[in-house]
Regions:
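Short, hinge-like loop/turn segments at secondary-structure boundaries
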Residues: 52-56, 103-104, 127-128
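General small-molecule cofactor/ligand-binding pocket signal
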Residues: 38, 85-89, 140
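Short, well-ordered secondary-structure micro-motifs
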Residues: 20, 47-50, 98-99, 122-123, ...
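A short acidic, glycine-rich active-site loop
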Residues: 54-67
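Glycine-rich, Arg-bearing micro-motifs that act as flexible, cationic patches
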Residues: 108-130, 148-149
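Small/aliphatic-rich secondary-structure junction motif
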Residues: 2-53, 147
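Structural beta-alpha unit
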Residues: 1-2, 74-109, 146-152
Length: 152
């Protein structure tokens, strides 16, 4: 029995994305696991049940997120011996990550931390911290500077 069969890799489309994908890819290769690239977009303000504004069933954000995930996969996964899929969700970030992990029965969650401290951490909080505290699954948190420049 393999330790990891399904790995969830949550990305934000920022400078941390290549590092997170790198770590997730290498673990997936080592264990022959399937990798799921996920981007969670915050719910739009008009998504509440009290809104009189109808929601597009396939909103622009999802198309944009999928296109960005496909670019990330092309740059860091294709031709690297890893089976992967792409998913998007619209939710609060930690909720979206945990929901996807549960839905796919992920064996591992990989995500980045930005190392916020002080007032910024107090006001914004940490998605990584919320995922770690609430997840029944192992979570690997990557600091972007942990991957040497040029290693993809």
């Amino acid at each position: 029995m393999k330790l990891f069969n399904k790995i969830l890799c949550a990305v934000e489309f920022d400078e941390s994305s290549p590092a997170v994908v790198h770590f997730a890819r290498e673990i997936a290769k080592e264990y022959g696991a399937t990798l799921c690239l996920l981007h969670v977009t915050p719910l739009p303000l008009n998504a509440t049940e009290f809104s009189p504004i109808p929601m597009d069933p396939y909103p622009v954000w999802e198309k944009t997120a999928r296109a960005e995930l496909e670019k990330l996969a092309a740059a860091h996964l294709e031709g690297r011996g890893v089976t992967y899929k792409i998913e998007t969700r619209s939710a609060e970030a930690a909720d979206g990550i945990l929901g996807q992990a549960q839905d796919m029965d992920a064996d591992l969650i990989v995500l980045a931390t930005h190392g916020r401290r002080g007032v910024s951490h107090f006001l914004i909080g940490s998605v990584a911290e919320r995922v770690i505290r609430r997840s029944p699954r192992p979570v690997l948190v990557v600091r972007p500077r942990e991957v040497a420049p040029g290693s993809n």
